[in-house]
């Protein structure tokens, strides 16, 4: 059984900055000077992370906001988090 304390909390990295654009957002990793683009749903997940929303709650919000299947929303959030984590744009911290 997975305990809540075993699941990391994802937070925006200190050296990541985001600017909203029409239909998405652009994220700058200030350490590497690399830019990344997010589509509309990716930008929504980023916004939710900035608000301190958990990955599970972010997926639930995507279901509400975009009327998508819960398993699809969960998979999309986890995939985005994995990519952001790999690029150093978010950090996984213990709860």
Short names for language-model regions:
Residues 1-25:
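Long, low-complexity, charged/polar intrinsically disordered regions in eukaryotic proteins
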Residues 21, 34-95:
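Long, charge-rich, low-complexity alpha-helical segments
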């Amino acid at each position: 059984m997975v305990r809540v304390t075993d699941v990391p909390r994802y937070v925006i990295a200190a050296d990541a900055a985001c600017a909203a654009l029409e239909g998405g957002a652009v994220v700058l990793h200030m350490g590497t000077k690399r830019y990344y683009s997010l589509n509309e749903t990716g930008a929504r997940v980023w916004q939710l992370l900035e608000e301190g929303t958990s990955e599970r709650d972010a997926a639930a919000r995507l279901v509400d906001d975009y009327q998508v299947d819960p398993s699809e929303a969960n998979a999309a959030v986890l995939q985005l988090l994995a990519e952001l984590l790999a690029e150093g744009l978010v950090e996984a911290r213990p709860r």
